[in-house]
Amino acid sequence: MPNANEPRFPTHVAIIVDGNRRWAKQRMLPVSMGHKAGFDRLREITRYAVGDRGVFVLSLYVFSTENFSRDAKEVGYLMDLFANNFRTIADEMNERGCKVLFSGRREGLQQRVLDAMDYMMDLTKDNEKGIVNFCLNYGSHAELTDAIRAIAAEVKAGTLEPEAIDEKVIEKHLYRDLPPVDLMIRTSGEERLSNFLLWQCAYAEFYFTDTLFPDFTKECFDKALAEYARRDRRMGGNTKK
């Protein structure tokens, strides 16, 4: 099993958390129970990936900008999960010396969710052993739109010359200036990015599994890491990475 000290170990792993509703449907349970099971699994995988396996950055796609179009009761339950559990996750990550960040638009989120998010970030802001990046009310198109608007405002204000705009400038205006994604994992059998970290995934390796997220165990995560270690990453060139 690859470890964090080996060259073929991913620095940044991103997971599209998918399959909670199908998990509940298969068991003839309410959708809310699927989300609860998925959130419990998310806490376990977060502790394991960053705290035990040594992944430096873990990005989790937990709620997209498009998810607000779902049934209001389901959205409300998800907001309850976030508001009621983020503080516990903050304590767990703080004990492990890991920082918690959020990527996404704050507009539209309930104040109690924002308060829990701010608590997590404030409590863990000085930690350096790893980063957990919760992507909440996130969409890559929205992120790039917001980045372009911010850059345009700087050009208009005269603080940035158009000729100075390059990839690094764009990256600094994304929600978070993090390393590029090395490994993108999607559960539930779907094989698409669904508007997640499009810029950051330029050279990512993709790992798709039929496993629904509530069933995505530590062993499943290790299997994804092992598959990544077998990949021949050339990053557009001839040199293996």
Per-region residue spans from a language model:
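Flexible, compositionally biased loop and terminal segments
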Residues: 1-241
